[in-house]
Amino acid sequence: MKKRLVTLLAGLLTVLSMGFGLAQFSDVPAGHWAKEAVEALAAKGIILGFPDGTFRGNENLTRYQAALLIYRLLQQIEEELKTQGTSPTMEALAPEDLEAMIAELKAQPMPEPGMDQAALKDLMDRVEAASIAADTALAQAQQLAERLDALAQDVEGVKGDLAGLRSQVEANADAIQALNELAVLLNQDVLSLQDRVTALEKMVSGGQELPDLEQFATKEDVAAVQEFAAALRSDLVGLSEKVSKLEGTVGDLSGKVATLQRNAFTISGSLSLNYSVYRAWGPDASAAGPGTANTFDIDRLFSSKFSTGDGNGNGSVGDEADLGKNTEGVTNATLSVSFSTGKLDAASDPGKLNSYPGLVQFSLRAKLTNPGKYDPSTGAPTYPINLTLDEFSSTLAVAKDQTLSFSFGRSVRSKFTEYVFDNDYNSRGHGFVATYKPGLLGATLTGVYGSKGANNGDFTYFRGARLALSPVEGIALGGSFVQEGLDANQGTTSASFPAPTTVYGVDASVKLGPVGLAGEYFNSDAAPNANGYYVKADVALGSISVAGNYRNIGAGVTGANMLSGDATSTLDQGGWGGVDSSGNVINGAPFRSNRQGFGVSASAGLGPITVKGYYDSSTVLANETITNSYGAFNYSANNQLVAYGGQADLAFGGFTLSGFYRIAQLNGSTTRYILTEKPAEAVYASEYGAKLAHDGASKDALVPKLNFTAAYTQKYDNATSGFTTQDIAVYGSYELALGPLTLKPMGRYHTQDAAAASTSSDYTTVKYGVAASIALDLPFKPSLSGEYYARSTQVTSANSGSSATGTISESKYAVGLKLGEFLFKNSSVEAKYASYTGSGLNAPILLGVADAASSTTSDYLYNNAVSSVGSNRGSVTGWYFTWTYWDLTFAYVEADVNNNGNQTHGQAFKISYTVKF
């Protein structure tokens, strides 16, 4: 009996240790180490399993389930004891029997403690694995809970916004709902009364004796109820009328609001008042008097209210003069106002038979400068207001799915294709553009007409049309025609009428899944060979992409000949390509003119590895000479240009390791550079090497905010006809925040080592610097800033060239203090001091060449002398003070420039007030 009890308890504990619910039949795996125990307990009725026939061995055991198991076990034990004729309780035993049982137990050998060790170890492993899984699930659940909390907050915010939007609607809706509910109740009462009347009528018609109605209500009660019902009906009718009026009013107001939104009128602009005085003395100062110009730049020292900005649009402010002129105190006032509308409604006139919602939209600009003091007795002086109509546009829905829109004004722009009549960046002149969409075959018909350059006396007009079709998704077709020339015989007394310039073209594109195909043909009669065509194709399948092209762009394809004002870049043949100082594309023509050829490129990726390759071959159609920052390129007709190369990249942990090999050939011979087929300042080069780069902005960055590059390049040298020029560059930058202090150090090392027979020089540049700023949470809200940058270039050998050897140096330091709250709110004061020094420069220090002081990819600060020592030296030093209260600014600056020993001093004072509205 005792052994049976121990066996049953051991089996129960085994099941409990694994958690109740190992599968009874269907979900208990065959060969499971606890399968025998489960089946034994199930056979004895201790374990019954779940109603679906499963045991669920991986679920936890509840206290209720444990109580039930123990209860069934005790019942089983009692039954077996009773079967053996033994009392089921220990109380039924006599003391001598208990003593005998105790003696018998003591005499028996001790059983081995615990369970089988292998089973226990397996049990512990399973428990540990379950614990780890539970911990992981708990952590994931906590993260999910945090995300759900954040999402709940966002949802609550959105609910708040929606509640605010619904508040006005609900205010009226509640009142209307209450009226509706009252009407429903009244209708129910009426129906109930009708039912009662019908029942009474049946009783009367059937001869039944009516009940004593007096016990329910007297006549006076009935009369009172009737009077109340009549009053309610009257109120209901009145309320219904009010609701109807309210609904009509709401609908009318909604229509008026929609009309006001469509007809929104916006006025914006600015009023600028400036008083300024400029003084300068020294050899490089301008002569005194009105109309004199500044002579030297101070943007290299610090930003200021005296900066003339990027006047030439080359992306640099250091090459624009800010000080050095002499002018008396001058006050300038400029009022600029812009009027713009939403889409205004319109009606036909006369008769107003048809109305056109959202028909018209336009904008106006007005500018008035230096109005002067007005004398009412003479009406002088008077100043004209320059009123400019930027653009007037409208869209008319002429029929279902058909629209007609047109626009006109000074700023109207239009574009047919990249080669034909591309004038969407630079307006070609005053005129109008009309666009009709008939709603058939995805068609768009565009017409243009205008005066080139507005009223400039040349009497030249342009007119053109374009039809574009998109019959199905992914397929587009287009045709363009445009002319420009004299209109009638205006501007000439000649009896003969000169022929206009005519340009036309057709284009098409197809996109079917991963395959894309596009092409264009264009022609102009403005010059010989002013025509061309190209075809482009590309395929992308996963990480593999292939692109190819064939082009034949004539030498006469220029911006002027194609009536494309956006083709204004002077760097490239035909003036195609280029971007503005803000990075906006001026013209996106895909290929350079004066070329016939083809090209192909491909790339493939496999995990962290990417492989790229290209091949391009072209023939020069006519003699050309192009000069850019890479040098002068003199090509003759029928010259053959070939370029090919490959590159492999390996990305890991924010790093990219690259290896490359590139070849550029002219007439079959390798050369250092050839121009690419693209209309931009770009070249194909002959070189090979490797580069390791770390991107601090990458999510996988090993060190966030650390940008680092190490590059080795072996360059081809035309003088030696080999890869004899070695180039090594290591550079980087880092941004470090230490509480309120921010540090941005940078550094660059660059060396070039050419062969003795090369015309290139040997030089080494070391460049370094740091910018620091700190904002303190103290009275007056002070903040400090400072920066220091320097570079030293050693030109050690001219080799077989003409470069001058020696040292080129540049350095710059600046400090600044700003009080964000000076004396009172919205008042701030700032003081700066800075100095820039250079020697061995290739241009006078009066102006810079480019702004590259903090650039890690440039060898210089502001003067681009690198491979040869120049003869210029000097310095620019100055200080600047400004006080600002709202839009009122007082600014003062003094600066000294030492230009090759010639000392010039400049100073300026300015008061400015600008209001924007």
Swiss-Prot record:
GO cellular component: cell outer membrane; pore complex
UniProt key word Thylakoid: no
Gene3D superfamilies associated with the record: 1.10.287.1490
Taxonomy, superkingdom: Bacteria
Subcellular location as annotated: Cell outer membrane
GO biological process, one term: monoatomic ion transport
All residue ranges annotated as the SLH domain in the record: 24-84
Pfam families in the cross-refs: SLH, SlpA_C
Keywords in alphabetical order: Cell outer membrane, Ion transport, Membrane, Porin, Signal, Transmembrane, Transmembrane beta strand, Transport
Signal peptide annotation: 1-23
Membrane-protein topology: Multi-pass membrane protein
Molecular-function annotations in GO: porin activity
The UniProt record lists the keyword Repressor: no
Domains: entry comment: Exhibits a tripartite organization, with its C-terminal part forming a homotrimeric 28-stranded OM beta-barrel (OMBB), its central part forming a long trimeric coiled coil that can traverse the large periplasmic space, and the extreme N-terminal part forming an SLH domain trimer that can interact with the PG layer.
SUBUNIT field: Homotrimer.
Role, per record: Plays an important role in the structural organization and integrity of the cell envelope, bridging the outer membrane to the peptidoglyan layer. Appears to be a nonselective channel.
Protein name stated in the entry: Outer membrane protein SlpA
High-level lineage: Bacteria, Thermotogati, Deinococcota, Deinococci, Thermales
Gene name per UniProt: slpA
